[in-house]
Amino acid sequence: MERIDHIAIVVTNINHAVNWYTKNRDCEVIYQDKSWAELQFENIKLALVLPQDHPAHIAFVDESLENGTKHRNGTESIYEHDTFGNIIERIKYEQDNRS
């Protein structure tokens, strides 16, 4: 069975969005920079992204992924569209960097 890694939603201001979610919801910030932030909830991660830097999407862990784009946090991923045009990210973690 596949596992959903995170859902990414578009916001217009990362700091404002992080402040709102951490103040109004029970979550913690696990990563934040100028273009995106990642919040950990009990059962899922929520990515807050800027529209000019990242698309809104849903990410699934895919340990069989090969030849994806490598990211500075040790993950590898590719983006694709489902049959309805929604953006899907397939993401693979390094063995020692699993979230």
Roles of regions detected by a PLM:
Residues 1-2, 8-46:
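Core segments of cupin and vicinal oxygen chelate
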Residues 9, 66-99:
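Vicinal oxygen chelate
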Residues 16-19, 65-69:
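Short, conserved charged micro-motifs
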Residues 27-62, 87-94:
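Conserved short beta-strand elements that form part of the metal-binding/catalytic scaffold
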